[in-house]
Amino acid sequence: MTNTSLQIGDVYALQEKEIGKWFAFQIVQIGEENAVYIDLDYWSEMIPEENDLNKMSYLRLNHHLWNNETNQCWAPIKFFPSHAKKVGNMSIRPFEECKSFGNWPNGSQQKWTEKWKKLPKDQVLAFKEARTKWNETIIVAGKEVKKNIYGLFDDTLSAVKDFSEFDKLPGLGRITTTKDNPQLIPFLERRCLIRELVWDNCQRRELDLSRTHLEEVEISGEDIEVIILPSSISNLTLRGKLSPNLRIHSPNDGYFMVLRVELHDDFLPDVGLSRLTNLRLTSIQDFNLKDIPARYPGLTWLGLAGKPGYIREVSKISNLRELETLTMDDLFGFSADDFPHPGNLPELRHLWIESVPAEAGKIIKKLYKGKIQDFQVLKLRSVEWLHENLNNPLRNWDGSEFVPKSKYYKSVALWKETRRRMMEEASHAELDFSAVKRIAIDYAEGFNKLDRRSSFIETEEREDIFNAFEQILNETGLSEFKEEIIQLIDEKRSW
């Protein structure tokens, strides 16, 4: 139902949670279920008053890849923030047609605008210019690369003796590596617009990133015992086996930071970060939540995803009194009696549950219906379904609105037959690699046929198909051929 209190031209203010400053936005278009807002250039420690309206304009964004553009977005009227303060109403200015759909603003655009104003202007201008050089190339490390290249990988990183060679590439924003180079961290420290680092198999005991400008870091390596993060960090992802001694140091002790952990054998070390606000655990097989509230009492977001798997002591979530968002996917082993009641989570606004026990899901649905702002319970599973699909990498397609039921069953049958053939081939004393390639081609062509008449394979399904074959390679001990086989499937596919 439309919230009739919203009017075109209305200006509202909210307080950004990390820094605490106030920002403003204007309603410029209203539809049946959604409204368009535009961010304004107000950013202050003071709550705006009506006499501040004549000083406000549309916020022009120039951070990251923005180029003097306004940020307008369709957002659901039913989720309009109830704590927003109405400042007043002013005439709207001309704006471009809005094609973006998302959530109501949280002050991130104003915050990033202020941060980028403090960066070295020469690096920002060079970065912006480089990102426009779509067709120009340059020789770096003896290789021809595009001037607007955003990411570097091991092949290029290993080809230079001096990282100053990469000063020819001011548009860089991401480094992906599996090797340790003593020049890497100093390079990241002086390049303030390289915001992402992916480091697999890091073998350092201590990783000091405190003087870098990184926003997103993804790390794997069981030798790491200390990670020191910069003040710019927003997302840290840990993958693979972790040291029980691992400690993570952050200037804000994890406040307003996302910590993602892809669990290995369900082990989550106590890494510190006592003020962490956003925790997301994936690849859960059998995990107990008993320690989570004591370690991270200030969580506002908790995301839990199984492999699928079992989750224990779900009732402990009731101790997270500041929790605003809870997501659970592919998790079993709990009942409705274990699940927190609405009154136990006073700040909860968003509850997204998918692929959970059918009996528990039905009761949770009744408990929360009409009690919170944003709520969905999907793909309720029986015990029989879990037993049949525990190792099925395409199980998420079952019940998907984008994958027809018949296509799902045929896809699973194709995957199972591919797995059977690969297991048989891998059991031979001598591997016939030509036979392995034939199986991979049949796999790709099988999905070509399934997708031919009713195209259902999009980006997410495509990734699932590749991941499903990678699972077969891992199971059969043929993961060393992954790159070549995946490339072959990529060449033969039409989806």
Regions found by a protein language model. Give the residues of each.
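Short coil-to-beta transition motif at edge beta-strands of beta-rich domains
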Residues: T2-E16
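C-terminal capping region of solenoid repeat domains
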Residues: G9, F339-D451, R462-D464
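Short beta-strand-centered aromatic/proline hotspots
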Residues: G20-G31
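Basic/aromatic-rich interaction segments and small domains that mediate binding to polyanionic partners
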Residues: Q29-L53
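Intrinsically disordered, low-complexity, charged/polar segments
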Residues: I47-V124
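Concave beta-strand-loop units of leucine-rich repeat
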Residues: T132-L184, E189-E206, R211-V226, P230-K362, ...
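Amphipathic alpha-helical binding modules
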Residues: K379, S455-W495
